[in-house]
């Protein structure tokens, strides 16, 4: 399923496309707190799990509350799973809160309390699929 080099646009075309996308983003990007400089990988991770099938407008206040209450994976891992479900609020699909709690425990147990930077390690966490792993790697660690 590879792409042959002949099928790719010329490098000048790619550079123009890249520039156009960045220009568009600079004008139209929404100011999301989890995209702000200084947001921890944990903050990015939590936002990506919360945003699965949930409108951003609902995610933002809950995300802020979670970051205040559980600023690290170890903080969430130490809480009762029921606390995570209750704090999930109106986000829907409350099993995601349980998966997030399980992921926090896995990070604490297997990754020294840190969000792993490798896509393969992210995929091994509960509740993390291809999109979430790629988004966390990109936005938290700058992996293209």
Task: State where each predicted segment sits.
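Catalytic cores of DNA base-excision repair glycosylases
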Residues: 5, 11-15, 19-144
